[in-house]
């Protein structure tokens, strides 16, 4: 049975890369159609690709597994960006207007675009979260329609090292598979928050902590706005490695952690110092030693979480408390440990999202929440070619086949394996051709987007030069902007050009003399 109009999402986790295909239903739920995963320990570190070849192989394998279940080729995917180096920084953009002007959405968009253009060495701005706008002496979140001659936009820029995004796109190009156009800046912690947090929690103020294998991500919300985001390079794997330091194999260390580990243990006076935890004679460790190792590392992670909450400046404003998610929350007593260490009393364990799922059974332990969130964020149909509806394909027969050594050969001497190989090659070439066409379209759109950004930059430079009374230079910038032939910018260019001409005339010697004589005549 084939599936059409489905969405495919892939999560690049530190322990495994997982792909999922699902279909959005009219009632708002998602029907999960297929799921596949590959080990990521040798290609993903701290949530970031470090071995491109192995990541490409894993992605290729996952795509093939999903296609095998769906019976349809996959043309594009949604991949979230997360991991170490992802964080937020504050930025402010100011605009001085010539006179009292009603703020338009176009002006707000221009200010927001300007903050995206702020250069940060070695980093790339993946997203911008507006905080508030200072209009006059007032702070507002929705300034459109307000009259003012001065506006100050305060933003939170979401940044990451340039290779974070570049490596994802490079691996997808090698597969080859296209990244969906509207997934260009799909940031995993943001879509996770949309899927896990309630509107009330975002509004009242909360911290979302995602305990992963190699990283712990902290996201803080207040008044429905992202206020702080940071990725701590510590996770569940650090606990496992600490246990390994006791001459224990990694697989056994993970088993000991899951079977006997606790994030918090109430102190006891009569602790048995000789108590031992054992995996059926395979390996063993002193119970108190294991408890101390786990508790020490958990406390280190929680101290870093608390530090990020403090750095945000919102530690006393989180009325909805903390929401914990991710595979790490399955460590026993994690909720108690979090409360004891951070002093945050209100804690919710989010082992599943707010999204209703149907179809294939999905783990409800917090480990798949980001994957489900990425699937829910998808909008485009990810199938490569839609098959003919309901029309069954005729059964193919080998004509004039001859039996030779147990195999069927066609009259031209090809074996079934060779026929299948040729068909597979043909399908691959068709897929690559479609991918190349889609890539060309995307590059054209990106080029157009870049042209518009350059035009907007020229306009802003012209406005600045106009304000500095450098009218000749301002006109040169406007002529360059006009020569780019961008229809939606023509009106703005003409308006500024007219304003420059009027100001130039007004401030010329002739203009000043005319104004002088007019003043004298008015006085007479």
Region annotations inferred by a language model:
Residues 9-10, 19, 79, 172, ...:
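Residue-level signature of catalytic and energy-coupling elements of molecular machines
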Residues 1-16, 20-76, 81-206, 263, ...:
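Nucleotide/phosphate-binding catalytic cleft detector across ATP-hydrolyzing
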Residues 10-16, 81-82, 201, 208-215, ...:
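A short acidic Gly-Thr/Ser loop motif
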Residues 350-403:
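Glycine-rich phosphate-binding/hydrolytic loop that grips phosphoryl groups
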Residues 318-341:
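Glycine-rich phosphate-binding loops at beta-strand->alpha-helix junctions
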């Amino acid at each position: 049975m084939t599936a059409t109009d489905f969405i495919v999402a892939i999560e690049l986790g530190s322990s495994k890369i997982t792909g999922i295909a699902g279909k959005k239903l009219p009632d708002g739920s998602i029907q999960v159609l297929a799921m596949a995963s590959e080990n990521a320990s040798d290609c993903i570190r701290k949530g970031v690709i470090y071995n491109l070849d192995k990541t490409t192989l894993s992605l290729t394998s996952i795509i093939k597994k999903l296609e095998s279940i769906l019976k349809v080729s996959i043309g594009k995917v949604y991949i979230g960006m997360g991991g170490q180096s992802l964080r937020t920084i504050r930025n402010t953009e100011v605009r001085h207007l010539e006179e009292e002007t009603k703020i338009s959405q176009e002006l707000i968009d221009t200010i927001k675009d300007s903050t995206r253009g702020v250069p940060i060495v070695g980093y790339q701005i993946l997203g911008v979260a507006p905080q508030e706008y200072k209009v006059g002496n007032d702070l507002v979140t929705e300034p459109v329609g307000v009259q003012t001659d001065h506006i100050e936009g305060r933003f939170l820029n979401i940044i990451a090292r340039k290779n974070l995004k570049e490596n994802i796109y490079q691996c997808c190009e090698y597969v080859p598979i296209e990244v969906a156009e509207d997934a260009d800046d799909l940031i995993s912690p943001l879509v996770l928050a949309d899927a896990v947090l309630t509107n009330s929690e975002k509004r009242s103020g909360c911290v979302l902590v995602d305990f992963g294998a190699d990283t712990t991500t902290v996201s803080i919300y207040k008044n429905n706005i992202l206020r702080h985001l940071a990725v701590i390079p510590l996770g569940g794997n650090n606990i496992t490695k600490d246990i390994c330091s006791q001459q224990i194999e990694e697989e056994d260390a993970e088993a000991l952690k899951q079977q006997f580990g606790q994030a918090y243990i109430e102190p006891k006076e009569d602790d048995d110092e000789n108590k031992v935890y054992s995996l059926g004679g395979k390996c063993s460790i002193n119970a108190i030693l294991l408890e101390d190792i786990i508790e020490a590392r958990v406390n280190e992670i929680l101290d870093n979480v608390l530090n990020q909450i403090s750095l945000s400046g919102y530690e006393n404003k989180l009325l909805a408390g903390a929401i914990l998610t991710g595979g790490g929350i399955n460590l026993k007593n994690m909720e108690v440990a979090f409360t004891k260490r951070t002093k945050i009393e209100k804690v919710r364990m989010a082992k599943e999202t707010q999204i209703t799922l149907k179809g294939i059974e999905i783990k409800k332990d917090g480990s798949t929440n980001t994957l489900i969130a990425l699937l829910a964020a998808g909008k485009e149909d990810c199938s490569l070619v839609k098959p003919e509806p309901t029309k069954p394909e005729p059964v193919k027969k080998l004509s004039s086949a001859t039996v030779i050594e147990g195999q069927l050969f066609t009259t031209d001497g090809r074996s079934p394996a060779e026929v299948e190989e040729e068909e597979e090659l043909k399908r691959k070439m068709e897929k690559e051709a479609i991918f190349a066409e889609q890539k060309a379209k995307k590059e054209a759109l990106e080029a157009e987007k870049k042209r518009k950004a350059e035009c907007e930059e020229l306009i802003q430079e012209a406005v600045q030069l106009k304000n500095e009374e450098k009218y000749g230079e301002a006109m040169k910038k406007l002529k360059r902007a006009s020569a780019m032939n961008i229809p939606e910018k023509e009106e703005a260019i003409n308006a500024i050009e007219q304003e420059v001409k009027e100001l130039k005339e007004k401030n010329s010697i002739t203009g000043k003399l005319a104004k002088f004589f007019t003043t004298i005549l008015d006085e007479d």
